[in-house]
Structure formats: C-alpha cells, structure tokens
Amino acid sequence: MRANVVGIAPRIAGPIINIPVHDNQEVKAGDLLFEIDPADYKTALDSAKAAVANMEANVRQKQQDLDRETELLQRNVASRQEFQNAQNAFASEMAQLAAARANLKQAELNLGYTKVYAPVDGYLTNVNTSPGAYVHAGDQLLALVDSSSFWIAAYFKETQLPSIKPERTVKITVMGYRDQPFEGRVNSVAWGIFLQDGSGGTSTGLLAAVNQTVDWVRLPQRFPVRIRITGKPPIPLRIGQTVTVAVEAAASPTPEGLSKQP
C-alpha cells in the first residue's frame, strides 16, 4: 500500500509557540498544525509600513518639484538640465517606493507564514518537534499522509500483462482484514523496470527495481501495476500494508498479485 506523503516545513525561521496537534492525528485541510512566534514578523511589518509611508511622502514632494520645474521650463525660466534632474529624482523615488511596497508585501507574507496549516486531508506522522524549539525555513517537522491518495503497486509477471488492461476491476485484500475485501481498478502498467543482471548499468531510482526470486532460473520479469482504490475502503489504510490483488478473470489472485511495500 502506498500514498502521497507531504513533508510539512515552515517557510520562515523562529521559535515554535504552539502545536495543537499530536502524532498520528487525523487532520483536515486548513487545520492549524503549528505556529511560530510572530513578534519579530509583526515588528518587521510595522517597519515596512512606515517605510512605505515615508517613501510615498517623498514621491509626493518630488512630484511637486517636477511639476514646478516643468512649468518653469515651459516659461523658459528653468534650464532643461534642472528639469531633467527633477525627472530623475522623481523616477528614483518611484523606484524606491516600488521596492518599499515589495518589502511590505513580503513582510505581510512572512507574518502569515508564522501559522502553518494542513494542505490536504490526512494523517500526521513523525511529529518531531515541540513548543520552544527553534526551527529554520525548510526544516521538515512532520509528515502528512494524504488520505485521498492511497494506491497499490502490484507486481505481475510479464506473461500476465496481456490480460491486465486499464480500468479492469480488481479485488483487494489487505493482510489482517481478509474478511473485508474491497474493489479497485487498474490504473496503469509500468513501461520499464531496472534489470538486475547489470545490463542496465547502475540503478538511478528512475525505474522500479524488482528482485528475481531465483537467480539461476530464467524467470519472467515482474512489472509494477498501479491500482487505484474505488470508493471508500471498509478498513483503515496505512502505507506499507501487505496487499493481495486479484484481477477479474485474468491473472492468478495469489503470489503473482502480491504487493508488499516497506
């Protein structure tokens, strides 16, 4: 059994002041996972607001200067150089105002980043932090198993692949819940595997590596078949569960369809 695992990491640094969740808890998208002390980021936001206000005042002043120089130039009282100087000063202040507004936007974002929320529905695992801990941007503090993303990788012999077609119904049985099977559908069949005989070079992890059962007998290769779960399973699903799948009137439902993922 497999699923998408989302690593939860802050986008800013600081001490954690609140963790309202616990390990192995089910959460919904939008639930607060943890909060970083916002004090420094509130101060930075106030400073950015003040900088924008100051730059806006400077721009207004430079606009007035430019308007005056424009009028004087039209009356042939001011030189073109003085007019150009006023233009350049106004353009410089406008650029600084744009930078100040960008800093303000970033300060607003950083303050918002002090609260980290669940991006999807799922189950928390490996929560390895606590209030008071100082964290850095990008530190993965916990993992969130996406509860809507469970799928199965079943390894079938290449001799069985002609009978395995996308959208074919399969019966799924999870070890420990053999009396509660449920259905799924074939999603896709892998287009390649890493050859263990060395002819494929060194594994890069881009192709699935499937171990042969007996080295001295030429056995059919096994290819991963991705199976999606249809409907709501009657049992709790966990990454790494041992699963047996039986494809409708096609391949053998036992060892050939056995999929065990660490």
Could you say what each language-model-derived stretch is?
Residues 9, 37, 84-87, 117, ...:
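Residue-level detector of conserved, well-ordered beta-strand and adjacent loop positions
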Residues 4, 11, 17, 42, ...:
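Elongated periplasmic alpha-helical coiled-coil
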Residues 16, 24-33, 69, 100, ...:
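A structural signal for short beta-strand/turn segments enriched in small hydrophobics and glycine
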Residues 1-51, 75, 81, 119, ...:
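Long, amphipathic coiled-coil "stalk"/hairpin helices in large membrane-associated assemblies
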Residues 128-130, 136, 140-262:
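Hydrophobic alpha-helical membrane-insertion signals
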Residues 40-109, 127, 152:
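Alpha-helical coiled-coil segments
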